[in-house]
């Protein structure tokens, strides 16, 4: 057990947390019934929001006066009430963070143990955790994690009419417009947007372009129309 943080608050001075997690993600299948045969045809599956349960332990609770314990519990209630959700970092998961987490279930305080304990259920509407940020200025990169990530590509353009980045499978993003040497082109694959010199240039994305994801493993990217480039991404973990 150790502390945890939620929505920018560090709970470790007040409680110890124990992660209670399922063995795997439960998927939501999409299926279509077919006349004349039993069952249905599986079309695919969706990854629903992740449920994370923490058991909180008030180790110092037995050393507090009744009013102090009441104040502490009120403080914890306030910290856990975040209607807009927040980032959640739990014990035993290293640098992983879940985004868009909101409290959707709680138990009563159990006074069986020395300082009292309770269970708190978080629903993480972005179910794939975020790990370490990575970057590469070469053409070969290694993506860690267990889920595809969407990169950001920054290019320093040469004078010309286009810049392009492509992967080993032939997928590419092409920006076609007049460019001056030194123009900064930023391709955000998550938002499927492009800026040139800080101004929106998404309308200049060429036909056939696809803002591709990078699956875990090795990749080789090619760049054209630029004198320098940097690829940044964040590891994603189930």
Segments (PLM) and residue ranges:
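Polar/acidic, low-complexity leader/linker segments enriched in S/T/G and N/D
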Residues: 1-33
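Short amphipathic beta-strand/extended segments with alternating polar/hydrophobic composition
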Residues: 11-16, 97-104, 172-178, 202-207
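Oligomerization/assembly interface segments of phage tail-like spikes and tubes
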Residues: 32, 37-64, 114-127, 219
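Solvent-exposed loop and beta-edge segments used for protein-protein assembly and interaction
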Residues: 46-50, 80-82, 112-114, 145-147, ...
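Intrinsically disordered, low-complexity coil segments
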Residues: 59-71, 178-180
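Short amphipathic alpha-helices in soluble, non-transmembrane regions
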Residues: 68-81
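Short beta-strand and beta-hairpin "edge-sheet" elements
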Residues: 82-128
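Intrinsically disordered, low-complexity segments enriched in serine, threonine, and glycine
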Residues: 128-238
């Amino acid at each position: 057990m150790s502390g945890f943080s939620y929505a920018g608050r560090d709970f470790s001075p007040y409680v110890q947390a124990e992660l209670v997690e399922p063995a795997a993600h439960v998927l939501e299948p999409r299926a279509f019934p077919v006349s004349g045969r039993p069952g249905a045809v599986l079309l695919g599956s969706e990854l629903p929001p992740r449920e994370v349960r923490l058991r909180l332990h008030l180790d110092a609770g037995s050393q507090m006066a009744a009013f102090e314990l009441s104040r502490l519990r009120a403080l914890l209630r306030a910290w856990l009430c975040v209607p807009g959700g927040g980032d959640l970092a739990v014990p035993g998961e290293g640098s992983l963070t879940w985004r868009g987490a909101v409290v959707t279930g709680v138990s009563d305080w159990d006074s069986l143990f020395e300082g009292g304990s309770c269970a708190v259920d978080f629903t993480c509407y972005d179910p794939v955790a975020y790990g370490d940020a990575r970057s590469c200025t070469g053409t070969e990169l290694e993506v860690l994690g267990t889920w595809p990530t969407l990169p950001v590509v920054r290019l320093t353009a040469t004078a010309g009419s286009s810049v392009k980045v492509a992967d080993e499978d032939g997928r590419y993003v092409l920006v076609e417009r007049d460019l001056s040497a030194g123009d900064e082109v930023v391709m955000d694959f998550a938002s499927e947007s492009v800026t040139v010199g800080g101004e929106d240039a998404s309308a200049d994305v060429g036909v056939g372009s696809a803002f591709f994801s990078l699956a875990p493993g090795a990749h080789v990217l090619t760049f054209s129309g630029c004198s320098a480039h940097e690829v940044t991404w964040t590891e994603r973990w189930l």
